[in-house]
Amino acid sequence: MARELFLKNYMEDCVWELLDQVLAQDPEACRCDSCRHDIVALALNQLPPRYVVREKGVIYSKLAMLEAQHRADIYRALTQALMQVKKAPRHER
Ligand SMILES: [Zn+2]
């Protein structure tokens, strides 16, 4: 059977992983699915992608979290995105 490969932006996993930490700093922030996705999308657009090659059907162990500098960048991008979404959520308050 042919191997089916695909690309995965590993940065996406990192951003989702840090999202809850950033939200924990801001009790007033909306935590609905729409806002969470908006925050992650905005943050990802500020961050460089980190693509890895994956093979369909293969279970991969989680890559080690990015180095401290990258974490700081992700944290900053998420914090900015959170403020943007808070100012203009795409739904009624
Ligand atoms: Zn919301």
Located regions from the model:
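Charged, amphipathic alpha-helical regulatory modules used
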Residues: 2-93
